[in-house]
Design a protein with these regions (language model features):
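Structural core of flavin- and non-heme-iron oxidoreductases
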Residues: 1-391
Length: 391
């Protein structure tokens, strides 16, 4: 597949971790021995000073005045010896605060939640990467995946092999992807670009800042479950980066178990629509090249044409969040009306509470956010270690 991109004139990149992400390459994985290892690295071997309580989702904070004392789950209260560190993510951390009476007063009062502190910025400033899939049926010689996913016996045998030693088809198919970041040539000449603030224009013109991302070999059944498992296909994801719109998450119930309403405001600005249309068109042009088209049988999911109207309509029909949400509890300086967390990750206006997840990150990186989330957690740990002399 990467040969097809190269023949079409797309650049290749031998190292996406070099500081320059531009170009296509095999995706970098955080797996070892057939297991996604990074997330549980600190749990192996099991730390003696750590207790994990399962099936105990936090519903609200225990607050006395301006002091956060602990957390409350359904039927149980847990009190902190030093601080509460909230790490529930960009959607759930604001939810816990709001159900604790900390957030936009109008929303809290609407659902009869007593207001402890009116903080309008809680749940605002949401940023996220959006994407759409496009998929094509391919000749049998183009991919081996249906020989696996379309064969129940092969999958069962592969599962036994993976359970035994972490090897085999189950350890590779879900992580064998191509990925790349690209710029749109001549974007700076468009009226949509010229209407942006100068600082934003300067940022987007930097050589290492992409306008969109492409992922290859994505499982089509995530979007089109009706496609037979024996179908030979190629599925691409087209991500739009550096969107100008800002969304929000808001209360829709007094029940802590009901998720916040998620409104990313995708494609709200003219610039966002312009970049979304052009990025999708560039990937579709790749599929028309001889190197790719010679093995194409037909389309499984694609726009009706490459007109601006059809491309935008396709985005509007199939658009998805990438679960890269940031900014709903934004970090900033005291006095910043959009900020609720300081540079020590402390929730401003309260003692005993820090936030350590992607909700505090004030920008949306031009990358997948896994590493950023890990760095945020590690930074919080370092600050706690220094402040309380934990080592």
């Amino acid at each position: 597949m990467l040969d097809i991109f190269e023949k079409a004139g797309w650049p290749l990149n031998p190292d996406h971790n070099s500081g320059d992400p531009m170009g296509m390459a095999p995706v970098i994985n955080s797996a070892q021995g057939g297991v996604r290892s990074t997330a549980n690295d600190l749990l192996t071997p099991r730390p003696e000073n750590l207790t994990i309580v399962t099936n105990a989702a936090v519903q609200r904070l225990i607050v006395e005045g301006t002091k956060v004392l602990g957390v409350e789950t359904k039927g149980t209260r847990y009190f902190a010896s030093k601080e509460v560190v909230l790490s529930a993510g960009s959607l759930n951390s604001p939810s816990i605060l709001m159900h604790s009476g900390i957030g936009p007063a109008g929303q809290l009062e609407k659902f009869n939640i007593p207001v402890i502190r009116d903080i309008p910025a809680v749940g605002q400033n949401l940023r996220d990467h959006m994407f759409v899939p496009i998929a094509y049926q391919r000749k049998e010689t183009s991919t081996s995946r249906p020989l696996f996913y379309g064969n129940a016996q092969a999958m069962e045998e592969a599962l036994k092999q993976w359970q035994k030693d972490g090897t085999g088809d189950w350890s590779k198919y879900s992580s064998e992807l191509g990925i790349g970041w690209m710029k749109l040539e001549g974007l700076e000449s468009s009226p949509e670009f010229k209407s942006l603030p100068q600082d934003e224009q300067n940022y987007l013109l930097k050589e290492t800042i992409p306008h969109y991302e492409v992922v290859t070999h994505f499982p089509v059944h995530y979007f089109l479950p009706e496609v037979p498992a024996t179908t030979h296909y190629s599925c691409f994801l087209v991500f739009y980066y550096n969107a100008q719109s800002r969304g929000e998450v808001t209360l829709q119930s007094s029940d802590p178990g009901v998720p916040l309403q998620f409104n990313p405001r995708f494609l709200e600005t003219a610039f966002d629509r312009h970049v979304a249309i052009r990025s999708l068109r560039e990937v579709i042009e790749l599929t028309k090249t001889e190197a790719f088209a010679k093995d194409t049988v037909g389309s499984l999911a694609a726009p009706n044409s490459d007109s601006d109207e059809d491309l935008l309509a396709y985005w509007q029909q199939y658009i998805s969040s990438s679960w890269h949400m940031t900014g709903t509890l934004k970090m900033g300086k005291p006095g910043d009306v959009d900020a609720v967390v300081d540079n020590d990750l402390k929730f401003m206006g309260f003692d005993g509470l820090r936030i350590a997840d992607m909700s505090v990150v004030p920008v949306l990186p031009s990358a997948h956010v896994q590493a950023v989330a890990y760095v945020t957690g590690a930074t919080c740990a370092e600050k706690l270690i220094r402040e309380y002399n934990l080592l």
